[in-house]
């Protein structure tokens, strides 16, 4: 399955209403900075917490885009509208976009 992926240059600023950013990094990574308003569910917890994720479009992020690609594939298999952020939080930070 091809995983839908968006480059940092393709992410609208500000993020559109109705888009949920799903951060699948570990808690220690999340604590070092994350996208304001993002939902945090570590990758390994996702199967047990799938029902917590709202309907609508999802932008899935991790540190570099590998874990988020796996999660995006999983979400698509479960009927969700998900896109992986290529380059993850490293690209987000390098683009000078805000983190909290």
Identify the meaning behind each predicted range.
Residues 1-20, 26-58, 66-100:
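Rhodanese-like catalytic fold shared by cysteine-dependent sulfurtransferases
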Residues 61:
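Short, surface-exposed ligand- or partner-binding patches at beta-edge/loop junctions that are enriched
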